[in-house]
């Protein structure tokens, strides 16, 4: 995963303390977006909990606290190619939605999140004169009280975190000061996208067959069994003559390297997967250091693996190129802009 997800935290000036630990999440640059929970205590503890609950697919990003959900909450997300020209669409959408619901004040932050929920509901392909992107309404199906019943040594810490979050985080229902159903919120979002932002919408509802395909593809990614079509979809490097693809599982997660080698010299390399660095430039500097050197495949893999181990990066299972899979599962076109 090359860029962090963003968190839109819906806040308003209310005298009453918030009751639900819920945020609206979005991604204004990355292709990957979801809703879920922050790190609860430490990575091993959280990973163990998620796997015991059967939640094998989640994004591990660093930092944060646990973020579990009231099952009636609704979130929104915008999925676009990594391009600056798309960044305003999300903010325009949120602004319009809040104004339509008479919410005077809200705040945008750029925190990081670890995600654990399944993706359900509507997926729409949006087009106007200047851009083409994907929009998703995401439903929350987690209940924060589950954590309180855990029989782990760190149970008390978990309870304390939950208590703190219930005092400090605010839900969409609280912002709008009314209950929000998924269907009503989706229709409101569609109205804003078409009437206010002048988008043409192609809507797709994921049926049972499409959802099975989507989750089967995610399972293939988890097992490092990726079809050639998926491997080639988002790589400009692979469209160049002489480019080869190396795929490798690293630690407990997934690492993928795209490389171009000519005359035994590494001309270009792009490393991606289910991991995050801080600062974010660290991985880019490492890639630049490798380029221009004579490296065979074995030595290159060794150097990259050594780098990750030295940086103490623990990658977790995550859906890689999730939007491409989502678009395919939803029956939408595979071409998105110039990517």
Question: Model-found features: residue ranges?
Answer:
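Flexible, glycine/charged-enriched surface loops at secondary-structure junctions
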Residues: 102-109, 196-212, 297-301, 313-317, ...
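Contiguous, small/hydrophobic- and glycine-enriched helical/loop subdomains that border
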Residues: 71-112
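Residues forming anionic-ligand binding surfaces in small-molecule and nucleic-acid pockets
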Residues: 61-81, 154-175
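Structured beta-strand/loop patches that form or line metal/cofactor-binding pockets in enzymes
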Residues: 210-265
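Active-site- and interface-proximal helix/loop "cap" or "latch" segments in soluble metabolic
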Residues: 260-336
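A conserved active-site cap/scaffold subdomain adjacent to cofactor or substrate pockets
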Residues: 162-205, 215-224, 229
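A contiguous pocket-lining binding segment that forms or flanks enzyme active sites
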Residues: 107-153
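N-terminal lobe of the biotin/lipoate ligase/transferase fold
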Residues: 1-85
